[in-house]
């Protein structure tokens, strides 16, 4: 494989893990951060592939800055951010595609806990987008004996799976923090999947994508690991800590907190049923206790399971 020049925007644990994978495949990696020594212009000088691994809140400003630099249309943009923009309700890749309409824009998402990837533990992910040549290029860049990369044309579904599961991870953290048991956790995760699918398909994603790595896979990883920041938010809320206290002590961004707010706004506008996410939202706003959130879900109207699985 020929050497590819890759620029990674964001030097947090996720950006660093992706950089390590690319370097292990003998590609040239340049890392940029807001506080780093390189300017954006310097970091992008040779970039053939641009990987964006910053938090959602920084995406709009960064996109505006990059737009001034006039990227070559051959540069592949890979979004590795999970979230929704509160101002526009758009996903990260939608922002990038609107900013660079002539560039291939892809999404990389899956059950990828950064610390495990840094330790070279086996993992798999999905790179998604409509440009098959670009997708296969990025697949080759990161694939290795410890990191298996699959492709998918459903860019939006892949992206939404990784975004929406962060909200559910908060709820599962609450479940674990309250010591509700394995049965409760299994029920919560299982009922969360159709909730994610309802939102995802309403917005244009394909239902089957949510049964893959970027949907169910990421949901399982994030909802069952204390390494997940979103899980930790829910767990510590159940332990009686306040949200500001939790976020202040958290190492990194829990995207699920912002995503919950945006998701509820979106669901209200579009009339999408999201009972689990709605209780997470009420909890994050301090309107109910973790125990009250549980009671609200358990006391809902009884119904057949099949009526809303998809």
UniProtKB/Swiss-Prot annotation:
Function: Catalyzes the reduction of the glycolytic intermediate dihydroxyacetone phosphate (DHAP) to sn-glycerol 3-phosphate (G3P), the key precursor for phospholipid synthesis.
Amino-acid positions noted as binding sn-glycerol 3-phosphate in the UniProt annotation, renumbered to this chain: 82, 110, 165, 218, 228-230
Cellular component GO terms held in the UniProt record: cytosol
Pfam families per the UniProt record, alphabetical: NAD_Gly3P_dh_C (PF07479), NAD_Gly3P_dh_N (PF01210)
Active site residues per record: 165 (proton acceptor)
Transmembrane segments: none
Species annotation: Acaryochloris marina (strain MBIC 11017)
InterPro entries linked: 6-PGluconate_DH-like_C_sf, 6PGD_dom2, G3P_DH_NAD-dep, G3P_DH_NAD-dep_C, G3P_DH_NAD-dep_N, NAD(P)-bd_dom_sf
UniProt: NADPH binding residues: 14, 34-35, 82, 114, 229, 255
Gene Ontology MF term list: glycerol-3-phosphate dehydrogenase [NAD(P)+] activity; NAD binding
Disulphide bond pairs: none
Catalytic activity: sn-glycerol 3-phosphate + NAD(+) = dihydroxyacetone phosphate + NADH + H(+); sn-glycerol 3-phosphate + NADP(+) = dihydroxyacetone phosphate + NADPH + H(+)
Gene name as annotated: gpsA
Pathway: Membrane lipid metabolism; glycerophospholipid metabolism
Keywords tagged on the record: Cytoplasm, Lipid biosynthesis, Lipid metabolism, NAD, NADP, Nucleotide-binding, Oxidoreductase, Phospholipid biosynthesis, Phospholipid metabolism
Name assigned to this protein: Glycerol-3-phosphate dehydrogenase [NAD(P)+]
Listed NCBIfam families: PRK00094.1-2, PRK00094.1-4, PRK14619.1
EC number(s) on file: 1.1.1.94
Gene3D superfamilies in the cross-refs: N-(1-d-carboxylethyl)-l-norvaline Dehydrogenase, domain 2, NAD(P)-binding Rossmann-like Domain
Gene Ontology BP annotations: carbohydrate metabolic process; glycerol-3-phosphate biosynthetic process; glycerol-3-phosphate catabolic process; glycerophospholipid metabolic process; phospholipid biosynthetic process
Location of the protein in the cell: Cytoplasm
Source organism superkingdom: Bacteria
Keyword Oxidoreductase among UniProt keywords: yes
Protein family according to the UniProt entry: Belongs to the NAD-dependent glycerol-3-phosphate dehydrogenase family.
